[in-house]
Curated annotation (Swiss-Prot):
CDD domains: AdoMet_MTases, Methyltransferase_Sun. It is found in: Cytoplasm. This is Ribosomal RNA small subunit methyltransferase B. The keyword Chaperone does not apply. It holds the Pfam family Methyltr_RsmB-F. Coiled coil: none annotated. The keyword S-adenosyl-L-methionine applies. The gene is rsmB. It is an enzyme of class 2 (transferase). It catalyses: cytidine(967) in 16S rRNA + S-adenosyl-L-methionine = 5-methylcytidine(967) in 16S rRNA + S-adenosyl-L-homocysteine + H(+). Its main location: cytoplasm.
Length: 429
């Protein structure tokens, strides 16, 4: 039976909601893919994520092919052309099928009179594809990052910026976290081998396993039984560093969607964990993850800047603060970040992080441990943030993560390793 939907028009709508309305893909896609088959859902995600990953290159190509950009109510057709170009350049979809489905998208979007224009632009690209792509390499669109972010990465990492951009522009690896309450990592690796799934352990993070070829979670042994969770290796490093112990009072602040909350409880199942996040909607994901893994924590809505409102005078042995940040370390997973963030956001985020860490510090017991983490690679949110905090608090002692002169540990995104992530482990003397 033929599908009653057109994936290319749905992708164009999703991209429009990201670029024109400032919504994230993760917020937009669930509603748009409700009535789509699993196979087509994977293709829709590829079209959306892929187009946003290489957006500047596609934009540059359109500028060479069209005298005027499509604006206003026609803007969604600009994105439809981008989706068409993405298929021709980056997918194995036969060109005739890519063209036919993309052109048909104009009818679904109620502008059938634009079919000729869209068809003409895509066919012209086919004729000039080799020449256009060669020319595209010689301008800044080749970097596939907005200019403000490119400048910040170059400034922060003069020797490594190109490797960072390359990693950001690739598809992310798929990492798993083995639930040590069910199996050791070596036991689960054996289960993967029996299921013909190739994987390898992370050299540092004790529960992390990388799949050589990503697969659907329903193919993973025991996924529905809670034997394993999909979580990036660098994110797993937070809990390894926190080192939670049974019987302790532990706060996971900015906890949604719950990956670190559940990791804490897998590492210390008798710990008393409070998971707090400001976003009530995202907290439902924390509850879902706890339920799937059959773990228990107290889950509360709360603003990290006002802890008295959600924990009163309670104090904690350990606090994990996965602070709100620019997410510049996870661009390969969320390419829409490149187009949703603005340069001015960085100073605003740094101010918010400072307010949260100041507010939560009094809630840590003497001798207690605070792990500050972000999925950012920008110094303003990381090393500079912690250096300023240590200067304000002589009772705060950095441990295991860098020195006072260069505080914290910065992971950079790597094709065969984890995402960009920063950690600082601090003891209250």
């Amino acid at each position: 039976m033929k599908n009653t939907y057109n994936l290319r028009s749905i992708a164009a709508k999703a991209i429009s909601q990201v670029l024109d309305q400032g919504q994230s893909l993760s917020a937009v896609l669930p509603e748009l893919q409700k009535n789509i088959s699993d196979k087509d859902r994977a293709l829709l995600q590829e079209l959306c994520f892929g187009t946003l990953r290489v957006l500047p290159q596609l934009e540059w190509c359109i500028q060479q092919l069209m005298a005027r950009p499509m604006t206003g109510k026609q803007r969604v057709f600009h994105y439809l052309i981008m989706v068409g170009l993405y298929q021709l350049i980056y997918t194995r979809i036969p060109p005739h099928a890519a063209l036919a489905e993309t052109v048909e998208g104009a009818t679904v979007l109620k502008r059938p009179q634009l079919k000729g224009l869209i068809n003409g632009v895509l066919r012209q690209f086919q004729r000039q594809q080799v020449e256009l792509l060669e020319r595209a390499v010689n301008n800044d669109s080749h970097y596939l990052h907005p200019s403000w972010l490119l400048a910040r990465i170059k400034q922060a990492y003069p020797a490594q910026w190109q490797q960072i951009l390359d990693a950001n522009n690739q598809r992310p690896p798929m990492w798993l976290r083995v639930n040590r309450l069910h199996h050791s990592r070596s036991e689960y690796l054996e289960l993967l081998t029996q299921a013909d799934i190739n994987a390898e352990p992370h050299p540092i993070y004790r529960d992390a396993v990388r799949l050589i070829t990503p697969c659907a979670v329903n193919h993973l042994p025991g996924f529905e039984l809670g034997w394993v969770t999909v979580q990036d290796a660098s994110a797993q490093g937070c809990v390894d560093l926190l080192d939670p112990q049974n019987g302790e009072q532990i706060l996971d602040l900015c906890a949604a969607p719950g990956g670190k909350t559940t990791h804490i409880l897998e590492a210390a199942p008798k710990a008393h964990v409070l998971a707090v996040d400001i976003d009530e909607q995202r907290l439902s994901r924390v509850k879902e993850n706890l339920q799937r893994l059959q773990l228990q924590a107290v889950v509360r809505v709360g603003d990290g800047r006002a802890p008295d409102t959600w924990c009163g005078d309670q104090q904690f042995d350990r606090i994990l603060l996965d602070a709100p940040c620019s997410a510049t370390g996870v661009i390969r997973r969320h390419p829409d970040i490149k187009w949703l963030r603005r340069d001015r956001d960085i100073s605003e985020l740094a101010q918010l992080q400072s307010e949260i860490i100041e507010a939560i510090w009094p809630k840590l017991k003497h001798g207690g441990v605070l792990v500050y983490a972000t999925c950012s690679i920008l110094p303003e949110e990381n090393q500079q943030q912690i250096a300023a905090f240590l200067q304000r608090h002589p009772e705060a002692q950095l441990t295991e993560t860098g020195t006072t002169a260069a505080p914290g540990k910065q992971n950079l995104p790597h094709p065969e390793d984890g995402d960009g992530f920063f950690y600082a482990k601090i003891i209250k003397k």
